[in-house]
Amino acid sequence: MLLKVLPYLAAMLIAIRTLRDSGLIDRLTALLAPACGAVGMDAELLPLLLLRPFSGSAAMAALADLFESHGPDSGVGYTASVLMGSSETIFYEVALYFGAVGVRRTRFAVPVSLAAMAAGVLTALLLCR
């Protein structure tokens, strides 16, 4: 079992580390910041939203950064906490669990999961205004 899961897990962890160290998350945040303003979301929440589908620990680090800069009781901290609870590590779970059982075609699992996460994010943003 471990030999089946380990390559998928290692590839996901390496990809996340590369994304963070390359600065791509920061560039995507700067690129998407105007769209955040249009929907009434703080742009500081973007790294959390970008990392959460891939890694829970990377998203937790982004949450800790938000708590350190804004405080957990601030509007940003409250919204980030709700977002963290209403989203899931979609790609990590797909890579790990589907890889473990040898499923090659995930069919509708990823699109439906992303749609559910989008619904959770929008609901969280509406409730935390």
Each PLM stretch: what is its role?
Residues 61-66, 70-129:
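C-terminal transmembrane helix pair
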